[in-house]
Amino acid sequence: MSDHREQQKDEIDLLQNIIFDKMKIVESEPNFKIFMEIKSDIEDPKMKFHLTVTLNEEYPDKEPTFELLEVNNYLASAKVRDLESKLSSLCQEYINMPMLYQMYECILSFADEEEEKLLKEEKEIQK
């Protein structure tokens, strides 16, 4: 097993121990492809994100490819593009280092912020 492949497997194993049932391995050959479901920890969140990440042979020395989807369509597409841009920047920042957990945390933090904004707006409307 190559060093990159071993690093990838170790990172995925560690991530599974942290986020448990919110992640699954979709493919393991020829490259790892993982799926994460991410939503805010607030009660009854409106938004849910699906992140699919494919690790190329050279990951983490080369950034992974990813696809992000906001499942419930609560966000404007421009906001989703902003989040994708944040993820791309994060991937560039973490070149040569494990970054899957950072990607997860980036989306979770974004979801928390947006959910709080939605709650505020709903409360304002109810007044």
Language-model segments: residues:
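N-terminal ordered "arm"
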Residues: 16-42
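Canonical SH2 domain fold
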Residues: 33-70
